[in-house]
Amino acid sequence: MEQPLCILGIETTCDDTSIGVITESKVQAHIVLSSAKLHAQTGGVVPEVAARSHEQNLLKALQQSGVVLEQITHIAYAANPGLPGCLHVGATFARSLSFLLDKPLLPINHLYAHIFSALIDQDINQLKLPALGLVVSGGHTAIYLIKSLFDLELIAETSDDAIGEVYDKVGRAMGFPYPAGPQLDSLFQPELVKSHYFFRPSTKWTKFSYSGLKSQCFTKIKQLRERKGFNPQTHDWNEFASNFQATIIDHYINHVKDAIQQHQPQMLLLGGGVSANKYLREQVTQLQLPYLIAPLKYTSDNGAMIGFYANLLINGKNN
């Protein structure tokens, strides 16, 4: 009898070390060991520190997954994009396991895995093509045209900062620890949003640009801090945070609307760390197209999505 698929997914693109195990298209293990506390000390990810953390945590994560090595049929790892040193650690670990277990090795595009994480715990038959793949994370802001599981075309990307990167830098200027996204998200109040609080970024729909908005935020924060009686411990950041988030998310959504008009997709898939943002998730649901959004526990970098996308590719080739 043929051995059932059991795919080990390895994720080391940035600051999270993760192992996922996919058995017969279902997530059997989802282990994430984060080094965020280390990076909070410097206000952001230090590549060398992240790479060393992966070296220390990969075997630990594998052991915590509980996977029986003899049951593994394939080994998938995040091959690109990501921090070079971190990618090297993950690739070396994957190649070593592949050699020791004599199992096939699958290099996986980290961003494609984010997109298709929206299908985890869903019926794969819900996927209608062509679709738009929306990636919003700390390192990337992009829109893909999904023609098949194997054919994704990049149709829009950031020319400077990614949305998640701006969140972290603005949050740091406000005095929040890394990562700042969840704190900013918690401050959002739609009734505080004003149409002219910030100048809105203006770019062609195929390009995102957030460096100008980031500069506006730094200027506004500086002005707030210079006000008489300002106390960073008690200051109410809700209005600032609400307008920042509305501006940056609305800009992304407007580009998505343009992409919908241009390419006429049948549905939307949303993934990436910032896809955990409540306002972004809400805006995607209002785009009048069928949609799938990554479950919250799979929005950050994780090995489960690496293994899951590998599983889709293997089954897609066999069918």
Curated annotation (Swiss-Prot):
Enzyme type, top EC level: transferase
Reaction equations catalysed: L-threonylcarbamoyladenylate + adenosine(37) in tRNA = N(6)-L-threonylcarbamoyladenosine(37) in tRNA + AMP + H(+)
Residues reported to bind Fe cation: H110, H114, D301
Single Gene Ontology BP annotation: tRNA threonylcarbamoyladenosine modification
Localization in the cell: Cytoplasm
EC numbers on record: 2.3.1.234
UniProt keyword list: Acyltransferase, Cytoplasm, Iron, Metal-binding, Transferase, tRNA processing
Pfam families named among the record's database cross-references: TsaD (PF00814)
Cofactor note (record): Binds 1 Fe(2+) ion per subunit.
Cellular component aspect of the GO annotation: cytoplasm
KW tRNA processing (keyword) present: yes
Binding site for substrate: V135, V136, S137, G138, G139, D168, G181, D185, N277
Function, as annotated: Required for the formation of a threonylcarbamoyl group on adenosine at position 37 (t(6)A37) in tRNAs that read codons beginning with adenine. Is involved in the transfer of the threonylcarbamoyl moiety of threonylcarbamoyl-AMP (TC-AMP) to the N6 group of A37, together with TsaE and TsaB. TsaD likely plays a direct catalytic role in this reaction.
Protein name: tRNA N6-adenosine threonylcarbamoyltransferase
Organism of derivation: Mycoplasma pneumoniae (strain ATCC 29342 / M129 / Subtype 1)
